[in-house]
Amino acid sequence: MLIEECPIIGVNVRVWLFWSYLRRPRLSRFLVGCIPVAVLNVFQFLKLYSSWGDMSELIINGYFTVLYFNLVLRTSFLVINRRKFETFFEGVAAEYALLEKNDDIRPVLERYTRRGRMLSISNLWLGAFISACFVTYPLFVPGRGLPYGVTIPGVDVLATPTYQVVFVLQVYLTFPACCMYIPFTSFYATCTLFALVQIAALKQRLGRLGRHSGTMASTGHSAGTLFAELKECLKYHKQIIQYVHDLNSLVTHLCLLEFLSFGMMLCALLFLLSISNQLAQMIMIGSYIFMILSQMFAFYWHANEVLEQSLGIGDAIYNGAWPDFEEPIRKRLILIIARAQRPMVIKVGNVYPMTLEMFQKLLNVSYSYFTLLRRVYN
């Protein structure tokens, strides 16, 4: 199965293949996609460096600068490590094909596949809608304004016809920028969903051990059959652990960047929302905050699900028919239970586990700094 044909990851992989971020890079796609977006981000930093006085303008420019810097880093990391991503996706496609043949796990696989595809497609539509808000907002404010504040040395970007040209270019670049940012979040979410499928498959295999024990006498199976099945469960458990480790290595450092940057931007946007008195600006700030929270929540919620379900592996064994097994098999089951007490975790910068508790702490810190800013401002 080709990676773009794998249903659970196919939506995001096709977007990346279209822009040549996977497999063989094509310079023509880079010249109309990620390279102009990276140049735009440089001009955004120049604008941010030269912005003084207007607090709302500074915060909005800072938000877009950080957002575009984040998506440029995401794409750069993807392109530089594309072989690593391709190998990971090939493993997902191969395992998906095997699980699809398993009648017991197929309903779970199909349910999570539908959920993953719906999440990927809805994220793209949400990104398109928010991006449309980005580029149309300047049309509803007095005076000339660009979707993204930029400074081009030696050029007055608000003078005719430069203003019109830059505006149209920014509208165009919003599309490839959206394709650089959204699929990475969806890739992470769908891959964690696939980890949940594998954990469910392991629990089913462990549950079948009890049925083996109960039918050994009637079918003439020896303890060797049960032992061989247990060895396969051990190997599969180790495979899932390696899968989560590989996924963590692909996202952990970018999650740290988002944790630091968007935590600060959330605080700044809340502050700007509290002092804004224009309805259009308040609506736009609300959409910015919603985008930050939705993307961050997608990361932390799915990572938390993997952690909780991996802890349930030990419960699946303990609730089985392990007292009926022979002592050598019981000892190996204890090893699996002991390993399951160390949950499979995806970490922020390989330091802190990504859990809903961690997400709540991020919100608490952002809100605390917001109240401090508000008090100082008043």
From Swiss-Prot:
Residues 1, 51-59, 142-164, 276-278 are cytoplasmic. It is a multi-pass membrane protein. The keyword Cell wall biogenesis/degradation does not apply. The keyword Cell membrane applies. Residues 23-29, 81-120, 186-254, 300-378 are extracellular. Induction: Strong response to the odorant 2-methylphenol when expressed in odorant receptor deficient Drosophila. Glycans are attached at N364. It is found in: Cell membrane. Keywords: Cell membrane, Glycoprotein, Membrane, Olfaction, Receptor, Sensory transduction, Transducer, Transmembrane, Transmembrane helix. One of its GO terms (biological process) is sensory perception of smell. InterPro entries: 7tm6_olfct_rcpt. Its main location: membrane. One of its GO terms (cellular component) is membrane. GO terms for molecular function: odorant binding; olfactory receptor activity. Pfam families: 7tm_6 (PF02949). The chain crosses the membrane at residues 2-22, 30-50, 60-80, 121-141, 165-185, 255-275, 279-299. Belongs to the insect chemoreceptor superfamily. Heteromeric odorant receptor channel (TC 1.A.69) family. Or30a subfamily. This is Odorant receptor Or2. It comes from Anopheles gambiae. The gene is OR2.
